[in-house]
Amino acid sequence: MSVIGTKKTLNLHKYSIKVNDFLSNWKIIIPVIFTFAGIISGCIGGKGEGRLYKVVADYFTNVILARDTLSIASEFIFYLIFPAIFLIAVFFLGLSVFGSLLTNAVPLTYGYLIGCVSFFLYNNYTLKGLAYCLIMIFPYGVLCLLSIVLCCRESISMSEYIVKSISKTGKFLNYGFAIYYKSFLRNFIFIIIASAVKTILQYLFGGLFSF
């Protein structure tokens, strides 16, 4: 009996450690949750044909799909600018005492846009739209979202660091602005890779899709 009781205690301790590890990563988990919430709300907004969905769909149709293919450098910059704007927003939110509260609005918004565009393409072009999403949107979008989510984690940490520094209730060891902006530079690599992948896919497969 004592052996069985010991095993149960060890198992409970093992599960409690896993739960604690899970909760300790909340700074990365919450942005991921907001991302999926944005994607789902974008699809729901498309199904209900909300006003914001129509704005996103019109912009995607008239600006993204209708434009002519540019030079390789121009295409790369075009795909780099959009997610870079989101990263800049996350960066400056992290320098605010309210950053930990507002930062998750960024992956929510980006996820909403992905959801809107995906629903629009599938709803209007079915299999052709789905193929476009799988080839042209999802590889690019996933890498951009990865960068945004990782930067959100750093933004929340920086905002907490500022709050604790001001209130003098505590401080993070080995953390500060230098670590903060360096982490953003590292995570920006995912945006660069995403833009390069999107540019290559556009030149390889862009001609297969005409809407």
What are these model-predicted stretches?
Residues 77-110:
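Hydrophobic alpha-helical transmembrane segments
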Residues 34-41, 86, 143-147, 190, ...:
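Alpha-helical transmembrane segments of multipass membrane proteins
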Residues 103-126:
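Conserved mixed alpha/beta catalytic, RNA-binding, or beta-rich assembly cores of soluble enzyme
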Residues 9-25, 170-179:
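Cytosolic juxtamembrane amphipathic/interface segments immediately preceding
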Residues 136-160:
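Alpha-helical transmembrane segments of helical membrane proteins, especially in multi-pass transport
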Residues 53-74:
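Perimembrane loop-to-helix junctions flanking transmembrane segments
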Residues 151-211:
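Terminal transmembrane helical module of multi-pass membrane proteins
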Residues 18-53:
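N-terminal signal-anchor transmembrane alpha helix
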